[in-house]
Design a protein with these regions (language model features):
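A glycine-rich, basic-preceded beta-loop-alpha segment at the flavin cofactor/substrate interface
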Residues: 42-44, 121, 242-252, 262-278
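A short, Trp-centered hydrophobic/proline-enriched beta-strand micro-motif
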Residues: 170-178
């Protein structure tokens, strides 16, 4: 007979026998430590370090990805995290290190510079980075998910060819601009506007609490489109690039958490976004 969690009736009986024996021994004045050293106990079926037996469900390739990510994180990130957290110090070379190992944009196809892994592998990478610090995981996951995935899923072929390979290597750093200072992450209340003009859009607005923005080269931002007639249309995504006139990204200092990763604003003061980046 087996219980639903895999524990046999014999193991349960052994546990109960031991429990009642301990109570009897305590009544006789036998020290607790002496009792447990001399009494065999049933082996626990629960594995605290893998409670859902995840490892048994992984493929060999997924285990290899996990182990490679774990080795890098423990060796390279673990050595940096205390200094980074204490002093709000972000090291941009981390992106290039991760890129060299294929840890950025894991699900991006090989033709655009990614390793073409599945989402299980991506989750395993994120978990290993998170073991060290949420700030480092934020750096990696913003680049991999919020920046690279929208470009890969919804961008033009030219946009994919231009942005994804350099984001995958970490040569370029990306950020994702949705949250605003007065409206949080509520898209319906979004105040940022993209005014249609000849050859592109004029971007006006502010984003807040944006991971990676002060060191970013690529800005995936969201705005409500305004037609040339003045009608406010749907929300659209735009890809802005470092150096565009009117684009700035001041840093936010004094955070309580995520101190190992840099956070900032995105300020768009009549930034011209060409049609090919919309």
């Amino acid at each position: 007979f087996m219980w639903s969690d895999g524990v046999s009736i014999n193991e349960v009986s052994s546990y109960l026998d031991a429990k009642f024996s301990f109570a009897a021994a305590a009544g006789r004045g036998v020290p607790c430590g002496q009792f447990f050293r001399s009494t065999p106990m049933a082996k626990a079926a629960f594995q605290w370090n893998d409670p859902f037996l995840l490892d048994q469900q992984l493929s060999d390739d997924e285990r290899m990805v996990r182990d490679a990510a774990a080795a890098y994180c423990q060796d390279r990130l673990g050595a940096r995290v205390l200094e980074a957290f204490r002093h709000e110090k972000t090291d941009p070379t981390i992106f290039r290190e991760m890129g060299a190992l294929g840890l950025l944009g894991p699900t991006i196809p090989e033709q655009y510079g990614g390793p073409g892994l599945n989402y299980v592998a991506y989750g395993l990478i994120a978990r290993e980075v998170e073991r060290i610090d949420s700030g480092y995981r934020s750096m990696m996951s913003v680049q991999s998910s919020l920046v690279m995935v929208p470009i890969n899923e919804f961008g033009s072929e030219a946009q994919k060819q231009k942005f994804l390979p350099k984001l995958a290597t970490g040569e370029w750093i990306g950020c994702f601009g949705l949250t605003e200072p007065d409206h949080g992450s509520d898209p319906n209340s979004m105040a940022t506007r993209a005014y249609k003009t000849a050859g592109g859009y004029r971007m006006v607005g502010n984003k807040m609490w944006i991971s990676n923005s002060p060191i970013a080269d690529v800005f995936v931002v969201w705005a409500k489109e305004v037609s040339e007639s003045g009608a406010v249309g749907p929300i659209r995504g735009f890809v802005l690039e470092k150096g565009m006139k009117g684009l700035s990204a001041p840093a936010v200092h004094g955070k309580v958490g995520l101190r190992a990763s840099i956070t900032g604003e995105i300020v768009m003061d009549n930034v011209f976004c060409p049609e090919e980046n919309a």
